[in-house]
């Protein structure tokens, strides 16, 4: 999968060198055939035949079996399915935390390891863990601190992100002083500060009340549209999946596989009025059927 | 501490303490116990005041040895713990040996230490360091490796280096554990330094105790012992105060 084309394209190792990536890539190859090949590399999230087997001693669990997906750059996908069907595991394969036993995963044409080294994705974890001794703003700015950005930039971006998730005024608070839902929003802000090309989110809205969740859904979509970032999000909520997706990836357990991929055709510029659209109910019903189908 | 509890927490121990001192004084005067066994509190205070310059100088020597030993032992313990966290093979090879060494009754091998290191401050510092080293090693290692799996994954997703992980996550997480070790060493290093002086020395509180003992100066012995006690308590108090300051941020 990774030939000379990629090593050329990723010569500049920093994300900001990649901004005009596609143009650079296409102009870099004088011969037509290579140019065409480079142009057809999956620029979004791509997985082919992913197997994940967890071993503990003689006991082994097949968490994922033959999972393949292709999420074009800038589009939005959600993973949905029963608890334990491997949603988090698939997300963590893209984050380079779980190494697949077999198969290929690519983010913008590069392996998860390279994507991580180049910091092109941001992860929101299921537990929204914070460092308990750091104030919220220092927690939110942690990723930028690790990247070595100067303090003023870090704080400016962290404050911006906190305002976006409605946590203005809690900068100096400690994580223990926040509710679970507020911590979850801080974790989302923490990911947004990185301005990632790929946003990998594991049930980021689980602990939120309906109203905040609604507001954040469309706030997130607005940010995604502005930045052109690609989204992969794990959820248990059928309506959330419909609102946030171009593609809903339905998974079934034991072993975890992708059973169905449902295209949601709401395009861009989605608003809360979406819920009133007759197609919304249809998509929900279709999704519910897919989830209840015996594997 | 709520305001209503504060006086009770102070007053009760003080009342019991005073009652105990009075009983002690009475016991010493009653003639039931020999003067050679137990001196009364007043007598001890008088002895302490009479010998204050001698006591002060020798306490300084013992304290200096304790502090230098504790500093060396704690720093070494922390450094080894950091190595343990980063190099698993080193930990697996060395940790069992370290535990084995901890079982060495260091006081029992004092004569050997004196042969090796002379009868100056060195063997006392060694013993104080030895006794501070293991609590710090074990506690710091526990603290440094006490990192939530999700936090580890988050830092991994940021491609954080091992040293960023150490300074931004492991060290802050280990601070409460390190204070546990420091408080232990606040008491043990003073005792270590004093006990090491018994065998061969020309200075220090331990030397004074032996010297007084040879001439049956019971009240003087007690005054030296109580002074050492007070110094240990002082060290403990300072450490505990630092701990409260350091941890007040993270646990409101
Ligand atoms: N580190 C691991 N070691 C061993 N088994 C694991 C590990 N991580 C996940 N598994 C197993 O893999 C399967 C899928 O787990 P995963 O966390 O991906 O599920 P999930 O779909 O995210 O569930 P949930 O909706 O409850 O979060 C489960 O059977 C789980 O026991
Ligand atoms: Mg999960």
Regions found by a protein language model. Name each.
Chain A
Residues 37-47, 53-66:
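A short, flexible loop at the N-terminus of ABC-type nucleotide-binding domains that lies
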Residues 103-113:
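Conserved ABC transporter NBD signature motif
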Residues 58, 111-125, 146, 151-155, ...:
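ABC ATPase NBD coupling module
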Residues 145, 152-170, 222:
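Conserved ABC ATPase "signature" region
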Residues 134-142:
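Short coil-to-helix segment of the ABC ATPase nucleotide-binding domain corresponding to the Q-loop/switch region
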Residues 95:
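Helix-to-loop junction immediately C-terminal to a conserved catalytic motif
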Residues 80-82:
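The feature captures the beta-strand-to-loop junction immediately N-terminal to the Walker
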Residues 173-176, 194:
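Conserved signature/switch motifs of ABC ATPase nucleotide-binding domains
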